[in-house]
Amino acid sequence: MQNNQFPHFSDEVGDRNMHNPYASGSSYDALFPPCAKLPYHGVELQPSAVCPKNFVIFDQTYDRSQVMYHPELTHKLMNTPSLNNLASTFQNEYVGGSYGNYGNYEQEVSSSYQEDPNEIDALLSADEDYEENDDNEGEEDGGDSEEVSTARTSSRDYGNTTAESCCSSYGYNNNNNNNSRKQSLSGSASSSNNDGKGRKKMKKMMGVLRRIVPGGEQMNTACVLDEAVQYLKSLKIEAQKLGVGHFSNQS
């Protein structure tokens, strides 16, 4: 018993129609009567003898859409108003909707991930004002900085990452980086009270991180943040080795 298989279309069997251009309206003059008008807009009609007689195939690609059918179904299709509605729906919802709104979708996604420029400015300005406010912060802490910084050592190696390797991996030079950052941020200071409070809070947080992270006082903001993450991971591993607490695999 012979197995029923789907027939190959003309662009798959390698015949003379394989490299022909897509059919246009003039290709159907021999199939449709002179008074017949094609009811489809934006969808190409593709009659083919290799199509099954009981199938009407809607094919959609990136740049075109077509309806393929057996030539004997031509007159039946022309007398079927519901097919016209189906083709219009296919064109509007799938062709226009899928590809016409692709750019709008990208724009919506990108707009949902916008960063707060005030927070970025506060982080960038932490390096600029760190040296000026370091002495004042030490006096306000009342000696607490000595207790916080007991674990600090510039030569400590954790997670195969040292303070020197962190700064070198970012390609930063502290002196050149501070000078260039001062120039880029000279006109970006905010005059509002809310921005001033946010900058002060951010600088205080970075000051604490610099005292906690080994070698943090010799790093810029980006290196301090990266080293803080690595340092916390190393502390988590050490605590797990000692059997202290129950930690989940979250970082």
From Swiss-Prot:
GO terms for biological process: regulation of DNA-templated transcription. Transmembrane segments: none annotated. Residues 1-20, 130-161, 173-202 are annotated as: Disordered. Residues 130-147 have a biased composition (Acidic residues). Residues 173-192 have a biased composition (Low complexity). Keywords: DNA-binding, Nucleus, Transcription, Transcription regulation. Residues 186-235 form the bHLH domain. Residues 148-161 have a biased composition (Polar residues). It is found in: Nucleus. Homodimer. Interacts with LHW. PANTHER family: TRANSCRIPTION FACTOR BHLH144, TRANSCRIPTION FACTOR BHLH145. This is Transcription factor bHLH144. The gene is BHLH144.
